[in-house]
Structure formats: structure tokens, C-alpha cells
Amino acid sequence: MEYKLVIGLEIHIQLGLRTKAFCGCKNEFGGVPNSRICPICLGLPGSLPSVNVELINSAILAGHATNSNIRHVVKFDRKHYYYPDLPKGYQISQNDKPICERGSLLIETSSGLKKINIIRIHMEEDSGKSLHLLDSENQSYIDFNRSGAPLLEIVSAPDISSGDEAVAFLTSLREIFRYLDLSECNMENGSFRCDVNVNLIITESGVEHKTPIAEIKNLNSFKSIKAAIEYEELRQKEEWVQFRKTLDSCGKHTRGFDDKNGVTVVQRDKETVSDYRYFQEPDLPLIEIDDFYIANIKKIKLIEFPFDARVRLKDQYGLSDFDVITLTTDKHLLRYFEEAAINASDPKKVANWILSEVLSVLNDKGISVLEFNLFPSYITELVEFIVAGKISGKMAKKVFLEMMSREVPASVIISENQLEQISDKFVIRQIVFEVLNENPKSIELYKKGKDHAIKFMMGQIMKKSSGKINPILANEILLQSLSNV
């Protein structure tokens, strides 16, 4: 039996706009329950929605970033379903005419670049949030603060073939939205949510069979998404062997992911389009957007996207794949590096220092690079001292700590404390000769193959120079001198 795993993703991204999609209420996470609502949020009789123009602008930018075709007429529809946290009984969304269609993203896989097509991007509003208390079986609460929050839904084509590819696509999409400042894309607070559609195409005796599509929900991390896909692949393969269920006979159903046990659990049959009874939203007019308007919106956010930045960084600075991926996860970190690298004699060493020492500080303090208290030029100068052999890497770390404490450049600290390494070969030879003359027994031990004698003599050299001698040069000159003794 041969089979192919087929995966499509539906991603909901809550936009970081100041106000909600169709009213003037603040669009913020958390807060006192039901403190940011109005008659429009609750669908009260007589309330009329109005479109937040920034929702349309955000959709245009998302379409541009994903190489999508952008529609010139915006139409909203009512999507009907009944949940306690949907007070109107319908959601304002887009059905047959999404604002963006036929886009794509390139992702990096183990076998190279792969194009993942995007079927559509459409605008809609979020629902409220139901809260079920563990200590109460008979009570639930509803917070409508999220009701009406602006969303974009991105629907990928079923071009994804593994859990790793799904995570790569989601990572790329998240980076783009963060680069554009459209959303925090934080799965913990619900601003980045993903449903995964999975099934298998099984080939037996030259005949293809499609297994029923499972739409998996309750996925709260990229790790969960990958685990759910891998579990579902095994489950559907076993189900085919036992029951030979097909897509034609069983259709599509919804499953939830049990993160604790690593399994998916049946929830319900999946609704069809007709179940939602779509029709055009009568309270919102058609909105026309011309090419000039779209071009102006694109110009506002004329930025380099992560994938393009990675290619450029490798070509321009010779950085590794790991380095460029890490640097481009945060556009502010990338900008910090480029400002530090612009006048550096060795940009790769600057990158190494930022990705090790600077990132370590940021992670320990739980801050972003925007809150870091050293200018990029300070890092450049510190690395130049290392490259020139004026201070050791070990000493540089001590200098770095004092730089952060005092918020002064490395040159000030090195000058005040006379920390500059001795790299003059003539001076180093003099110190080496002194140590050799004072330690004839160590020379004899070295000749007998005792390696610890070298370590002892290097220790004496460092002691005589108060730790300021260049250890690499000192070791070279010591070995040369011993070969001539």
C-alpha cells in the first residue's frame, strides 16, 4: 500500500488594529469581561455596522505579501450559525468573493524550496469567548470583549505533505504578519489560530482512494500541530486497513486534539457551505478599491520580507542558514545586526556575538532588542577589539557586562582598566624566554612528552603579563622556542 499525506491549513489571524472590525470599540486582549462592547458587538436591534478601513488596508498588505490577486470590489456576507458566544446568530465574513485569491508562499524544506499555494484570504469578525469553570457543571460564562475583533482567515491549498512543512508554512506566515506589524501572531492569546485538514490518498493496484478529511481543532502550539498531523496520519492509515472508509462515503468531520494524550478525538460532522446559509450583508455596501489605492497601501509598508532577507544576508555577509533564520525571526533584531555590521571588518563575528551574547541577555531579561541598552555601534567596536587581537574572547565577555552596567563603549572600559592584550611578538618573546629560564625542569618534562608542562609554562606566562598577553600568539612562540631548546 502506497499513500500520500495531504494537508491544508485554515489560519485565523487577529489583527492588531486600534478598533474592532465593524464598530469603534477598542480592540485589545484581556481586560474586565464585557467592558469593551457596544450594541453593534452584541447585535442589538437597530445597531448598524460600519467597516474599519484599516481592516481592508491590512488585507491588501497581506495579499501583497503572499503574492495574491487582490479583488477590486469588497463584498461582505453573513455566515449563520448558532453558538452562545455569537449573539447576532451570524458572523460578518466573506463567502464567494474574498478580498484576496490565488496567492502563494515559498517554504524551506529538507529537500529545498517548495511553493505552497494559498486559495484565499478573507476578512471577518471574531466571536465572543465562552468560559467553562471546572468547579461548576451547570454554569458557563461568556465574555463578548472579543466579539467583532478584526480577523483575516488564510486558507492554504492542500499542498502540504508533512507536519514539518505545515510548521514551516505557519512560521513563514507568522513572520510576514509580524514584519508588517499587522498582528502579534501569538497562539497563547489567540491572535494566531490554526485548524488543520488532513487526509490520505492511498494507491492500491493502481487505483487511488481518498480517506475522509479530518479537520483538527484545539491546536495551541506549533508542536501540537505537528504532533496532531503525525498522529492523524497513523490513525487514518489504520482506519483504512480496518474499515476502508473513503471521502465519498464518509465526507469530512471535526476532531479535537488532546494535547495531554497526543491523540485526536471526534467532535462532530463538519458543516457544509449550505449549512451556513450565506447571503450578502445588507447593512454594508459594496466597496470599490482601485489600482491607485492598492499601490499606495503597498508603498506604506515597502519592506523586505524574511525569505528575501535570508537570501541577501547569505550572499552579502556569508552567514549560515541558522544565523540568517535566527536574525530574520525579528525584524528589529535584523535591523540591529545590520547597523552593527555596516562598519565591521568581520560581519560574521558580529553576527555570532549578537546571536550568542546579546540574545542570551535578551532572553534572560525577557526583553526585546528595542529595549536593549547598548547601541549597535558598541557591539561593532567590541568585536573589532577581539578581531584585532587586542582583547581575548574571555575578557570581551567581562567588558560586555560592564558595558551594559555603565552604558559606555568598550574603548572606555578597556582604556580605564588597561585591558588591551599584549600582541607585540617582541614583547611576548621576552616574557617567554624569562619563563623558560626560570623553569628548566618544565623544559625537561616537555621533552619527555609531558603535556602538562606546556600548560604550566603558559600559566606562568599569563601570570607575568597579568593575564594581558595574547594566549594564541604566546602559545605559538612558546612552542617555537621549545623546539629550539
Curated annotation (Swiss-Prot):
UniProt entry tagged with the keyword Nucleotide-binding: yes
MF (Gene Ontology): asparaginyl-tRNA synthase (glutamine-hydrolyzing) activity; ATP binding; glutaminyl-tRNA synthase (glutamine-hydrolyzing) activity
UniProt KW ATP-binding keyword: yes
EC number: 6.3.5.-
Intrachain disulfide bonds: none
Pfam families: GatB_N, GatB_Yqey
Reactions this protein catalyses: L-glutamyl-tRNA(Gln) + L-glutamine + ATP + H2O = L-glutaminyl-tRNA(Gln) + L-glutamate + ADP + phosphate + H(+); L-aspartyl-tRNA(Asn) + L-glutamine + ATP + H2O = L-asparaginyl-tRNA(Asn) + L-glutamate + ADP + phosphate + 2 H(+)
Family annotation (Gene3D superfamilies): 1.10.10.410
Record SUPFAM superfamilies: GatB/YqeY motif (SSF89095), Glutamine synthetase/guanido kinase (SSF55931)
Class in the EC hierarchy, top level: ligase
InterPro entries listed in its UniProt record: Asn/Gln-tRNA_amidoTrfase_suB/E, Asn/Gln-tRNA_Trfase_suB/E_cat, Asn/Gln_amidotransferase, Asn/Gln_tRNA_amidoTrase-B-like, GatB, GatB_Yqey_C_2, Gln-tRNA_amidoTrfase_suB_CS, Gln_synth/guanido_kin_cat_dom
PROSITE patterns: GATB
GO annotation (BP), single: translation
Record key words, sorted: ATP-binding, Ligase, Nucleotide-binding, Protein biosynthesis
Family in the record: Belongs to the GatB/GatE family. GatB subfamily.
HAMAP family reported for this sequence: GatB
Function: Allows the formation of correctly charged Asn-tRNA(Asn) or Gln-tRNA(Gln) through the transamidation of misacylated Asp-tRNA(Asn) or Glu-tRNA(Gln) in organisms which lack either or both of asparaginyl-tRNA or glutaminyl-tRNA synthetases. The reaction takes place in the presence of glutamine and ATP through an activated phospho-Asp-tRNA(Asn) or phospho-Glu-tRNA(Gln).
Subunit structure and binding partners: Heterotrimer of A, B and C subunits.
Protein name: Aspartyl/glutamyl-tRNA(Asn/Gln) amidotransferase subunit B
